[in-house]
A protein has these predicted regions:
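Immediate post-signal-peptide N-terminus of mature secreted/exported proteins
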Residues: 19-66
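Short helix-capping/linker segments at secondary-structure and domain boundaries
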Residues: 59-70, 157-161
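Generic cytosolic/nucleocytoplasmic N-terminal low-complexity/intrinsically disordered segments
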Residues: 1, 22, 28, 39, ...
Length: 162
């Protein structure tokens, strides 16, 4: 029940400082205290949930003024911590071809839609942070709609480099 409350606060109050952990003790607390019933949901579903939380944390951090690189570091630490805290090995997420399993991809796409508003706000900020011209509203919408897939693609790229 405590975890359900924490997750609810995490997604309902994205402007709070806790929504974007930045201090080592916040990451440690998440790792030690945030747990889902992964035996009930399955490790793959839990991994998809954690990937989605990391993706949403990224856009929350960007919207709070963090540079995209810093936002990525924050979301990576969050992901690693909650995966470790829930004793889920990253290898379970991948096929033999080193792609994220389709069931995880689909769940991440669904779950990242929960932070769609935050993603919409973050897209122009991401372009501005890189010194690029803001894309048209149509392109911003497409980027927002495909955010979960982009996030998955980044994870696959990193995993394939190892």
């Amino acid at each position: 029940m405590k975890c359900l409350l924490l997750v609810s606060l995490f997604f309902l109050l994205p402007a709070t400082a806790f929504a974007v952990p930045t201090k080592p003790e916040q990451f440690e607390k998440l790792e030690n205290e945030f747990s889902l019933e992964c035996q009930k949901y399955g490790a793959e579903s839990c991994a998809a949930r954690f990937i989605s939380m990391a993706a949403c944390t990224y856009v929350f951090a960007v919207n709070q003024g963090k540079h995209p690189d810093e936002a990525m570091d924050i979301s990576d630490k969050l992901f690693v911590g909650i995966m470790r805290g829930n004793k889920i090995k990253p290898g379970i997420m991948f096929t033999e071809e080193r792609n994220i399993k389709p069931s995880i991809v689909n769940e991440v796409a669904e779950r990242t839609a929960f932070c769609k508003e935050a993603t919409e706000k973050a897209v122009p900020k991401l372009f501005n942070a890189r010194g690029m011209e803001e894309p048209s509203l149509e392109i911003q919408k497409r980027l927002t709609d495909s955010f979960g897939y982009w996030w998955i693609s980044n994870i696959e790229t990193i995993y394939k480099q190892d």
